[in-house]
Amino acid sequence: MPKPPVVVVFDMDETLGSFGQLGILKDVIESYEDRHLTQDEFNRIIDKHPEFIRPGILEILEFVVGQRNKKLCDSIMIYTNNQGPRSWAQSISEYFSYKIGTPVFDHIVAAFMVNGHRVEPSRTSHEKIYNDFIRCARLPSTTEVCFVDDVEHPRMIHDNVYYVKIKPYHYRLPISHCLERIYPSDSDRQLECLSRAQARFHPNSLRGDEKTPEEQEVDKVIGRFMLKHMHDFFLGLKRTHGKTKRKYSYRSRRRTRHL
C-alpha cells in the first residue's frame, strides 16, 4: 500500500509574521510612487523591518524545505483567510522564497470570499475545514497534514492532522519610524507618505506597539517549540510508516498542540 502524501500547512497572518503595517506601507508607497512595487522592492521593505517576521520562522521553513528535498514531505502550503487580493499572499510567499533561497510554498489556498466575491471556488465557508483544504489542494483524503495556525479551527481537527496551535505574533512599529527606515535621507518623502497614511488609515493602525525584551524572548521560545513540533511530526511519520512493527499508534495519540 503506497504511503499517503505528507504536507505542511501554515496560516499566514500572525503565524508567519505580523503583516498589517506592511500592507499599510505598501499601499502608501504605491500611492506616492503612482505604480506597483516590484517584488524586489517589496522584499527590501520587509528586510528593513525584520520585526514583521515571526522569530524562528525562517529556520522552521528551512527545516521543512529540507524534509521536502529528502522526499519526506510532498508539499508546503499556505491556508489563509486574509481578505486582501490573492497577489498579497503571493508576495508574502515569494519573500520567504527569497530569504530561503529556493521556492518554499507549493500552493496557496486563499480566502473563501473577499468583499463579497468568491475567491477560492472549492471552499465552502470562511471556516477552515479539513475537507475543504483537501479539495482545494487536490489531495487524497489519506493525506497526512501538519497544520500550524494561531487560531483553533474546530473543523481542522482530524485524525490525519497534527495541529500546532500557536500564540499569535504581533509587532507594530510607528509608521513614521518605518518611513524613516525606507527613506532615511529624504524627509520630504517621509512627510508626504505619512500624510497619505494619516488620510487613509485609522490613527491606531499607525501607532507603534513595540515589545519588551521579555515579550520578545517569549516569541523566540515559541519559535523553538514550533521547530520541535516539526521534528516530532516527521519523527512520528517515520514510526507510523516505518517497516518495523510499531509499539504504538502515532495517529491515535494526536491532539492539538498549544504554544
Where do the protein language model's features map onto the residues?
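Alpha-helical substrate-recognition element adjacent to the catalytic core
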Residues: 1-117
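C-terminal cap/substrate-recognition subdomain and adjoining C-terminal extension
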Residues: 85-259
